[in-house]
Regions:
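N-terminal and secondary-structure boundary signal
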Residues: 1-205
Length: 205
């Protein structure tokens, strides 16, 4: 088992954040390896879409047998929400991530970067979540939910709906109206409508 991460951009240090959060100690106890993506190797990956031709992805993500995402549930001032599709941005080399912010179409660019890797399972920790602001500062509330799926579009749709249950949230549109999800559907990254999603409840957290 390998636990990997890449902080958003300098001066944030992935190694520092891992140490602060106790990840190194937890991995030692579990017998897991740690991968600090910015300190490792990157592999070019071609993308489908019109906004990126290719990006570099952390090599361990392409060589592992199974890739499991561990995501947060939050709003985002630029991409509107940050769940599993936006989580994929952390898989990409920082200098390529910077291109998100040039040329407009930020939400569509997020969806295209998400096509660089294919997780087998996505787990979203929504015990607490941002309901306004984000990704780093904003209004935090308790959502008391854990989500798991193999489909990034499906889990992001449900994640948005969980945020929308909380009074004062910033997400006012039907999930399928957000451009990040619309472009992900065009790229074939997941479910295309509610009829393709089955919600199975497994108790409360």
């Amino acid at each position: 088992m390998i636990v990997g991460e890449s902080s958003r951009h300098p001066p944030t240090s992935t190694r520092y954040e891992f140490r602060r959060a106790g990840v190194f100690a937890a991995c030692r106890r579990a017998g897991a390896e740690v991968a600090i993506f910015p300190e490792g190797e990157w592999t070019p990956v071609r993308l489908r879409g019109s906004l990126f031709r290719w990006v570099e992805v952390a090599r361990p993500l392409l060589e592992c047998d199974r890739l499991i995402y561990a995501c947060c549930l939050k709003t985002h001032w630029l991409s509107k929400f940050s769940i599993s599709l936006k989580h994929s941005v952390g898989c990409v080399r920082p200098r390529h991530r910077a291109r998100l912010h040039f040329g407009g179409h930020f939400e569509e660019r997020v969806a295209e970067l998400a096509g660089a890797v294919q997780p087998s399972l996505i787990v979203v920790d929504g015990r607490q979540c941002y309901v306004r602001g984000g990704p780093c500062y904003g209004v935090v509330r308790e959502a008391n939910v854990l989500l798991a799926a193999g489909d990034r579009v499906a889990i992001d749709v449900q994640g948005i709906r969980e945020i929308q249950r909380i009074p004062g949230n910033a997400l006012r549109h039907d999930p399928w109206q957000y451009r990040q999800l619309q472009h992900a559907v065009r790229l074939g990254l997941g479910a295309a409508n509610d009829d393709q999603i089955a919600l199975v409840q497994a108790g409360s957290c």
